[in-house]
């Protein structure tokens, strides 16, 4: 099966069922080093351990990302996603309101980094022992 199809299935599944332990174990199994998730377009740039890349194109469900920065909203939204109080799409919209343009999830470091349009780091969190979705 084509890598794009495999990764699309993995990302679609975690967006729906929010099973993060399964999600991260699948990414490790497929030798993912890290991935970059672009909030506005839902494009995902996956980097494998051998430095090959895979691009997953979003579904054209565009959201506007604010220029204002709100670290508290990021943390609150992330916690709500982990506790399944909100859906992944609500998570995505709230992060866009908080000024998140993209996030980078490093599988080896078990960290997620949230960045703004100007590439400044807004927030960092651990992805260990979480039950969160597409990158917390």
Swiss-Prot record:
InterPro entries: DUF1398 (IPR009833), YdfO-like_sf (IPR036696)
Highest taxon, organism lineage: Bacteria
Gene3D superfamilies referenced in this protein's UniProt entry, alphabetically: YdfO-like
Coiled-coil features, chain-numbered ranges: none
Pfam family, one: DUF1398
Family: To E.coli YbcV and YcgX.
The name this protein goes by in its record: Uncharacterized protein YdfO
